[in-house]
Amino acid sequence: MANKKTNISVVLPVHELVGEDNVKLFNNAMTSVGNQEVKPDSVLIVVPEGSEVYKTLTEMDLTTYGVKTTILENPGGTDFSSQVNYGVSQCKTEWFSILEFDDEYSSKWFKNVVKYKDAHTDVDVFMPIIIDINQKDGGFMGLTNEAVWANSFSDEL
């Protein structure tokens, strides 16, 4: 499938990349973006301002992943939420997806997202979250995303 503009950015918050294992996880996450059948428009890597991780990332060749990638220094808090919020505030696309540095997308993730958002134009937010309910009393048990995440590897929407 030829790549087209998806109008989606990936926001990838990174607090630190210490040790070979974390660098490998980051590379796997970025490779999963680059290996998409339909690529997102850009990746925004958000790091704490003035951090060592900024230096580490600027020394890496981020062009090898095949997606426009920008490193943003978050001038405020260094927690996950503030990094996500800052990244979202810098998006130039209508849609965004949050990728943690130790997670990966299936190769058809964005292809399926584009199909889904095109088929459901009245929806403003897509969240791969399932609310687990106790069948006996209908009470809240928790939130999960594993079933939705695993379904992204399926050909079904």
Model-based region annotation:
Residues 6-11, 42:
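Cell-envelope/extracellular polymer assembly enzymes that use nucleotide-activated donors
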Residues 28-40:
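Short, acidic, metal-binding catalytic loop of nucleotide-sugar glycosyltransferases
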Residues 40-50, 70-74:
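Short beta-strand/loop segment that forms part of the nucleotide-sugar
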Residues 74-91:
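Glycine-rich, basic loop-to-helix element that forms the pyrophosphate-binding segment
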Residues 96:
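Short aromatic/hydrophobic "clamp" motif used to bind/position activated sugar donors
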Residues 100-104:
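The conserved acidic donor/metal-binding loop of glycosyltransferases
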Residues 110-143:
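Conserved donor NDP-sugar-binding/catalytic core segment of glycosyltransferases
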Residues 129, 143-157:
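Short, flexible, basic/aromatic active-site loop/helix in glycosyltransferases
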